[in-house]
Amino acid sequence: MKLVLGALQWTAFIIAAAIVVPVAVAQSFHLDHSDSARLIQSTFFVLGIAAVIQCLKGHRLPINESPAGLWWGVYTIYAGLTGTVFATYGDTLRGLQGALLVSAVCFFLLSVFKVIDRLAKLFTPVVTGVYLLLLVMQLSQPIIKGILGIGYRQDGVDGLVFGLALVVIAAAFIMTNSNIMFFKQYSILLALFGGWVLFAAAGAAKPIEMPDRLFQLPSLFPFGTPLFNSGLIITSIFITILLIVNMLASMKVVDIAMKKFSKQPDGKHHERHAGFAASFSHLLSGLTGAIAPVPISGAAGFIETTKMPSKKPFMLGSILVIVISVIPFFMNTFASLPSPVGFAVNFVVFSAMGGLAFAEFDSYEKEESKRVRSIIGISLLTGVGIMFVPETALKGLHPVFISLLSNGLVLGTLAAIAADQFQLWRRRKSDNLVSTENKH
C-alpha cells in the first residue's frame, strides 16, 4: 500500500509539474485539438520512459523528468519566426524535430568523449548553492502568478482561485510539518487531489474532455519528416551544452537531498551514463514529436517535503505516467487538474530548496567566506538581473543569444562557474609562486 501511494504521489507530481509546457507550446503553434493531444501524449510518453531509463541505467537517482525550459524557449522563439525561417507552423515543428535529433547526437558525442565528466567537476558547493537560489527565484514568478489565478479563468487576479490556492498551501504546510507520518509522507498527493476536489466543489475546476478512442500510441514523425536548418543546428548544439549544465546541477542537488535521509547514493559517478540516457530521450523526442525532457531539480524539494527518497515508488510512478499517456481518457483526466493547485503545491516544494542552497554555502571553511560571497554576489546580480530584461529587448538577436539571455538560471550559473574557476585558478597560481619561492 505504501508503495502504491508513493507511486501515485510521484505520478501526480510529475504530471502537475510538466503539463503546462506542452499545452503552452500547442497554443503557440495554434494546433487543433487532435494535434495538441498528440503533442501532450508524446511528451508524457517520452518523459516517463526517460525517467525509468535514467533511474535504471543513467544517473540512478529518483529525479523526475519534465519538458526542458530551454527547449520550451526555443519552440516559442521559432513559433514567432514562422513565416521568416520556415513557411508554416508545420515546417517549423519539422525543423524542431530535426533539432532534437541533432541534440541527441551531441549528447552522445559529449558522453563518449567524457566532456560531461569534466563539466561535472565544475559543480562545487558554491555553484550548486547559487543554482538552487536562482532556480527558486526564477520559478517564483510563474508560481505566484499561478496561485493568484492569473491566466487560469481570466487575465487578472482571480480572488476565488487565490483563496482556494491559499487553502491548499496552508494544508500542504500543515501536513508536511505534521507529527503523523502518513500526512508527512503523502502531503503532496493529498494536497493535489484534495485541492482538485476543493476547486471542483467551488466550481473552479475545468471539465474533463472525453476522448474519441480508448488507446493510442505516439506516432512516428507526427508533423512530417524532420527538416535540418543551419540556424537550428547551431542552436541545438548550444542548447545541449546548457542542458548538460542543468542536468548535472539536478543530479547534484538530489544527491545532496538523499544524503539527508537513509537512502545514500552509491558514491559512483554516473554523469556519462546520464548523458547517454539523455541522448536516447532526445532521439525518442525527435522521432515522436515530443518536447524533449530534462531531469529537474524539483525532485530534491519533493524528497525534502515527503521524506521519501526511495527509488521504487519513483520507478512505479514513472511507469504509471507511461501507461496514462497511452490511454487518452486517463491523460485527459490528469490534464484537467487545475493548474493553480499544481502551483500551490510547487510553492511548498520549492520553498524547501532555499535551505539546501544555504547548507551548501555553509559547507565552506570561514577562511573561504569572502571568496564565496563574492561569487554569490556576481552570479545573483547577473542571473536575477537578466530575469528583468523584457523579451521584446531581445528581438532581432540570434536564437542562440536569446536562449541564453532570456534564462537567468543558466546565465547566473555560468557566471558562478566562471567566477569560481577564475578565483580557484588565481589561488593555485599564488600557491605555486609561494612554493617556488620557498624552494629557492
From Swiss-Prot:
Membrane spanning stretches: 3-23, 39-59, 67-87, 96-116, 130-150, 156-176, 188-208, 231-251, 283-303, 314-334, 341-361, 374-394, 399-419
Assigned keywords, A-Z: Cell membrane, Membrane, Transmembrane, Transmembrane helix, Transport
Family: Belongs to the nucleobase:cation symporter-2 (NCS2) (TC 2.A.40) family.
Any one biological process term the GO annotation gives: xanthine transport
A cellular-component GO term for this protein: plasma membrane
Induction note: Negatively regulated by TnrA under nitrogen-limited conditions.
Protein name: Putative purine permease YwdJ
Naturally occurring in which organism (per UniProt): Bacillus subtilis (strain 168)
Cell compartment(s), UniProt: Cell membrane
Entries under InterPro entries matching the protein: NCS2, Xan_ur_permease
Bilayer topology term: Multi-pass membrane protein
Superkingdom of the source species: Bacteria
